[in-house]
From Swiss-Prot:
Glycans are attached at N35, N77, N297, N803. Keywords: Disulfide bond, Glycoprotein, Glycosidase, Hydrolase, Lysosome, Signal. GO terms for cellular component: lysosome. Its main location: other. Belongs to the glycosyl hydrolase 2 family. Disulfide bonds join C167-C176, C540-C629, C732-C761, C764-C769. GO terms for biological process: carbohydrate metabolic process; glycoprotein catabolic process. It comes from Capra hircus (Goat). This is Beta-mannosidase. It is an enzyme of class 3 (hydrolase).
């Protein structure tokens, strides 16, 4: 949603200023620590860590063990100071406010040495009345308290009962009692990220002065009238009216492409007032709806709303308006004891394909527009249509949601509560209410947001006994839970936004949870709602490992990032899987060993005598393992779309954990810190393809399903091929008769006992051959070429090291890699080191002598740079 505020100055009458003045206080500030031993300039928006780094007082916080070495920063109390002059007489204004869009987090704000307010919530806007205090020359001070010390103090004062958890596991090197502070929860440490509890003015800060009124919030929501079959637009504008007299005027709504030019008379009385405008769109006007990526266009309409008020005051708001409906469908299913759980967009059931979003950096001032676009473009480039903004991070910046609107990425928006119980004392709840009210107002105009969710895993934490809470206090914890998420957050959301569903938690049993008093004994019931699923010990190639659930909003496996990413934050002594650095960077208990165990199920572990080579091979194999595991699991969910087996199934969402990284470390991500694609992300591009053949075995029978997310039916054929590991010559193939693949369906296309299939392919055994398959029509490929391994690759017979070469050429801004191989090669990995960009495909099975792959650079590069940086690896290279 593009939103601009134009403050149009009107002439002053009788010495009385009627305009609204906004004075930015962004830019250069000064900061000092508690005892004044450190004094330095700091940029606003920004944080203390970034200021220290920019002045070279500290090194890169992500380098090696610096997250431990720089813990002192978060334990100190920092003060931000800015001296500024005003070039007009502020006494002529009825109201002057000092506005902070975001303060991180606990602080006392002073103007000219006089306290004007306190802050305790990173997620809300603060506006302080300084009308009678502001001078020609002013000094603002923001005196921060250490968030770590504050959280501990709040916990110590909560003596009535324990509010768990106290501290993160020691392996995370984190801080304690994060649930007692309204701050980015993962800033105290998580199992994929460091602990950097920041302090600073992390969003815009300004002075606003006005005499009549000021427009604080501008919101709009399209509403479809099913009975009349017409679109309406509800526009809400929240004003602070300081004039003692009635303020009259007009509100003019213009949407030229929809032939809308509507004038409304409005009246504003003293106080906080909301103007509601309703625009009815003529039925004869064709309104193009907003669709998720892969299902249609993201059509938006330019709208201008102008307020012309008494005294010549004029406000103008410009925004992009999108029209779409969303419905969460929970209804009985034939042959199943539960309810469905899926989303309809514009009346069409949509399978949500995507991932989970975490903060892109511990230091939000480093998250640039280019970084956001790169990461979100990578989402749609991998055929995803949805992201879940996870509840332990932040409500993302405006540009994030604007890009999601533009790209067609549906957002499951958590409120920022995660993996903990929370206090419900009065001042905490007051702060939360302000937070939720602000965020709903700020975000509800975005079509990309399709649902609100109250928290991440807190229902499960409470009802499944994660924190060994005493049974005698269960009633108290349940009461607190309902108070926070139902009586407050849910109530505020439903009052402020009736256009999208609200879910209490994730995972949850949806309507069943509601019926059971907002908490279910088992929030992971596969017959209801959404589930989170993790299992690192079972064989991930076995599809029976995975839950046949209605909707899976978290699942995944870890891997390490590439060597080129790690190299930037490590030294030579760190380049071993057993190094102190490797252990320090891993924040999941037993995470490194569990990756090796999963690898060993199907691959040989690297055994090179060269330590660096062995380390690089291990990094590669963790990515192979992760990609193959998540592929198997995701394909299981996609093919379960139309199935009910033993009452289970009708899966309509697969959001793996996680999309992006917050730093350079092992995690569940498919995008490394900086945006480089892991092998998993290339796999996601294939397993989330709109049209996909999925192969698996059940009782020695090979089944191939066709899965379609296409909006219409298509005629096609399935080709099944069998290759031997020892030769690039095709052994045998089958071609089905033409069939019609219906839109939005998953159906069996092929089934054959594996012994029968191999019998028709001379010399083939499970160990010596591999199956591939694809969908096509008239010789045109319609789907990715998928494959099915008939045995673990550690038992593959005839698999040789392949000599793979590349000839690189340039076509415009794209580079062409013409590959040649001497042998069949699984998991072919093309790498150009630190040159930013992505390939058209990667991590693939190469069964033919030649293949062409394209490289799309994100920054200017050259053929010679690519040739110098290029390296190719396939599985046999690690033996």
């Amino acid at each position: 949603m593009l939103l601009r505020l134009l403050l149009l100055l009107a002439p002053c009458g009788a010495g009385f200023a009627t305009e609204v003045v906004s004075i930015s206080l962004r830019g250069n500030w000064k900061i000092h620590n508690g005892n004044g031993s450190l004094q330095l300039p700091a940029a606003v928006p920004g944080c203390v860590h970034s200021a220290l780094f920019n002045k070279r007082i500290i090194k890169d916080p992500y380098y090696r063990f610096n997250n431990l070495d720089y813990r002192w920063i978060a334990l100190d109390n920092w003060t931000y100071i800015k001296k500024f002059k005003l070039h007009s007489d502020m006494s002529e204004w009825n109201k002057v406010n000092l506005v902070f869009e975001g303060i991180d987090t606990v602080a006392v704000v002073l103007l000219n040495s006089v306290p004007i307010g306190k802050t305790d919530n990173m997620f809300r806007r603060y506006s302080f009345d300084i009308t009678h205090m502001v001078k020609a020359v002013n000094i603002i001070e923001v005196r921060f308290q250490s968030p770590v010390i504050y959280a501990n103090q709040r916990s110590e004062r909560h003596t009535a009962y324990w509010v768990p958890p106290n501290c993160p596991p020691p392996v995370q090197d984190g801080e304690c009692h994060v649930n007692f502070i309204r701050k980015m929860q993962c800033s105290f440490g998580w199992d994929w990220g460091p602990s950097f509890p920041t302090q600073g003015i992390w969003k815009d800060v300004r002075i606003e002065a006005y005499n009549i009124c000021h427009l604080n919030y501008f919101m709009f929501t399209p509403i479809y009238d099913n009975y009349m079959e017409t679109w309406n637009l509800k526009i809400e504008s929240s004003f602070d009216v300081v004039s003692s007299k009635l303020v009259s005027g007009e509100a003019i709504v213009a949407i030229p492409e929809l032939n809308i030019q509507q004038r409304n008379n409005i009246e504003l009385r003293h106080g906080e007032r909301t103007v509601k405008l309703f625009v009815k769109i003529d039925k004869a006007v064709i309104v193009e709806t907003w669709w998720p990526h892969g299902h249609g266009n993201q059509t938006g309409y330019d709208m201008t709303v102008t307020f012309e008020l008494d005294g010549g005051l004029r406000f103008e708001k410009s925004a992009k308006v999108y029209f779409r409906t969303v419905e969460l469908v929970e209804e009985p299913i034939q042959n199943s004891p539960g309810l469905t759980f899926y989303f309809k967009i514009n009346g069409l059931p949509i399978f949500l394909k995507g991932s989970n979003w975490i903060p892109a950096d511990s230091f939000q001032d480093r998250v640039t527009s280019d970084m956001l676009r790169l990461l979100l473009q990578s989402v749609v480039d991998a055929n995803m249509n949805a992201l879940r903004v996870w509840g332990g991070g932040i409500y993302e910046q405006d540009e994030f949601y604007e890009l999601c609107d533009e790209l067609g990425i549906m957002i499951w928006q958590d409120f920022m509560f995660a993996c903990a119980l929370y206090p419900t004392d009065e001042d905490f709840m007051d702060s939360v209410r302000e937070e939720v009210t602000h965020q709903v107002r700020r975000l509800k105009s975005h079509p990309s947001i399709i649902t609100w969710s109250g928290n991440n895993e807190n229902e499960a934490a409470l009802m499944m006994g994660w924190y060994d809470t005493k049974p005698g206090y269960l009633h108290t914890y349940i009461k607190d839970y309902v108070t926070l998420y139902v009586k407050n957050i849910r109530t505020i959301v439903l009052e402020g936004d009736q256009t999208r569903p609200f879910i209490i938690s994730s995972p949850t049993n949806g309507a069943k949870t509601t019926a059971e008093g907002w908490l279910s004994p088992n929030p992971y019931d596969l017959n209801y709602g959404d589930v989170h699923f993790y299992d690192y010990m079972s064989d991930c190639w076995n599809w029976r490992t995975f839950p046949k659930a209605r909707f899976v909003s978290e699942y995944g496996y870890q891997s390490w990032p590439s060597f080129s990413t790690l190299e930037k934050v490590s030294s030579e002594e760190d380049w071993s899987y057993e190094s102190s650095f490797a252990l320090h960077r891993q924040h999941l208990i037993n995470g490194n060993s569990e990756m090796l165990q999963q690898i060993e199920l199907h691959f040989k572990l690297p055994n090179s005598a060269d330590q660096l080579r062995r380390f690089k091979d291990t990094l590669y194999l963790t990515q192979v393992m992760q990609a193959q595991c998540v592929k198997t699991e995701t394909e299981f969910y996609r093919r379960s779309r139309n199935e009910i087996v033993d009452g289970k199934g009708h899966t309509m969402g697969a959001l793996y954990w996680q999309l992006n990284d917050i730093w350079q470390a092992p995690s569940w991500s498919s995008l490394e810190y900086g945006g480089k694609w892991k092998m998993l992300h290339y796999f996601a591009r294939r397993f989330f393809a709109p049209l996909l053949p999925v192969g698996f075995e059940d009782k020695d029978v090979l089944f191939i399903y066709g899965v379609s997310d296409l909006p219409s039916d298509h005629q096609m054929m399935l080709t099944v091929r069998v290759h031997t590991w020892s030769s690039l010559e095709l052994v045998c193939s089958e071609l089905t008769n033409p069939f019609v693949m219906k839109a939005g369906e998953s159906v069996v296309l092929y089934s054959k006992p594996v012994p029968e299939l191999l019998k028709g392919c001379p010399g083939c055994t499970r160990q010596s051959c591999v199956v591939s398959f694809y969908l096509s029509t008239d010789g045109e490929l319609l789907s990715p070429i998928n494959y099915h391994f008939l045995s673990s690759l550690k038992n593959a017979k005839g698999l040789h090291k392949a000599n793979i070469t590349a000839t690189i050429s340039q076509q415009g801004n794209t580079f062409v890699f013409d590959l040649k191989t001497s042998a069949v090669a699984p998991f072919v990995w093309l790498d150009v080191g630190s040159i930013p960009g992505r390939f058209s495909d990667n991590g693939f099975l190469m069964t033919e002598k030649t293949r062409t792959v394209f490289f799309y650079p994100w920054k200017p590069t050259s053929k010679s740079e690519l040739e110098q940086s290029f390296h190719v690896t396939s599985l046999a290279d690690t033996y």
